[in-house]
């Protein structure tokens, strides 16, 4: 199983940016934690972080050709603005879980709307880095469940 983890703008500044909201743990720590859990579950995980909307769209489109089973995406600020990312996700038709470190529904009014949630199978928010692990497990369970269903 192959899962792509995409992180949007400013997530490379985890541990530096607004630690009262996002904590003091760094982006490198996040990647290490996800890799550890993925390795236990024998899942291949690839990571991508960009501050640029077009590069995120390009990566989503490449995921189609690279045959990823799932995408975990934290679009960060693009959550609330990017129809382009929504359209890219819809076009590749890959199982997608949206993740947010903070609970966007408890933040400023403009952060409460998510375009990505219009496509994502589920949204996990407010659980910190654990949300990524929950997303990983969600995709694993969904894909494995689909395979078992197809085998019957």
Regions inferred by a protein language model and the residue ranges of each:
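Extreme N-terminal starter segment of soluble prokaryotic enzymes
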Residues: 1-4
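Short, electropositive alpha-helical surface patch
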Residues: 55-71
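Short beta-strand elements at the ligand-binding edges of bilobed clamshell
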Residues: 110-129
């Amino acid at each position: 199983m192959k899962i792509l983890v995409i992180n949007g703008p400013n997530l490379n500044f985890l541990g530096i940016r607004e630690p009262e909201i996002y904590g003091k743990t760094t982006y490198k720590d996040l990647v290490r934690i996800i890799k550890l859990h993925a390795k236990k579950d024998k899942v291949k995980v690839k990571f991508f972080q960009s501050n640029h909307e077009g590069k995120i769209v390009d990566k989503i489109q490449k995921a189609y050709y690279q045959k990823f089973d799932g995408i975990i995406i934290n679009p960060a600020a693009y959550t609330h603005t990017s129809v382009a990312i929504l359209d890219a996700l819809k076009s590749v038709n890959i199982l997608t879980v949206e993740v947010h470190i903070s609970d966007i529904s408890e933040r400023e009014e403009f952060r409460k709307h998510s375009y990505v949630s219009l496509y994502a199978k589920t949204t996990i928010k407010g659980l910190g880095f654990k949300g990524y692990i929950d997303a990983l497990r969600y995709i694993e369970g969904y894909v494995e469940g689909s395979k078992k269903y197809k085998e019957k």
